[in-house]
Amino acid sequence: MRSCFVRISDEPTDVPVVCWKQLAMSKSYVVTRVFGLLAPMVLLFGGCKENVMGEQRGIVTMKGKPVTLTGTPVNVGQKAPDFEVVANDLSAVKLSSFAGKTCIIASVPSLDTSVCDIETRRFNEEAGKLGGDIVVLTISMDLPFAQKRWCGAAGIKNVQTLSDHRDVSFGSAYGVLIKELRLLARAVFVVDKAGVVRYVQIVPEIATEPDYNAVLKAVKEL
């Protein structure tokens, strides 16, 4: 896509705001002066639109209905993007906090749904069989309080549940944020001890469980 720029001040900085050709042809914009600087406020109708985060449609469905994933998709072999989420005790947790360990990262829409409940219990069971250098993280948009309550009721000991509700840091960095619902898609990522993505599984239908055997196979092959 061709880059579009509008100069908004006398400083030598071009800010990608809107397609200039469309702006010149449109009367639907207002330019205001704020503290001596020109700040364009542009109302656009189609055509050249801002694309802050990449969007993917048709990758996954929710009960058969296609949804839009936003963020930056990750690929096997790339350095795993760092992110910051919130633990049950409200402390900040980053992926880099687990440097030197293999991480299984499972994103789910909500622990309060039956499929997410089943999935997290299954990973909790499997995590108990893995070595101490492997950690399992389950990330959702649930509030930390709700996650803590659920873990207590379900007896979850081997999986760390983390909340992405504050900044959507994980969902944006891994391309699994559902635009229409502000929930995370069902996906599983395996990151090795060197911080490299070794496995990616985006579950096509959110209402179904992931392929556990494929995830465990990827971990055991590291």
PLM feature segments, named:
Residues 48-222:
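Chalcogenol-based redox active-site neighborhoods
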Residues 35-44:
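Bacterial N-terminal signal peptides
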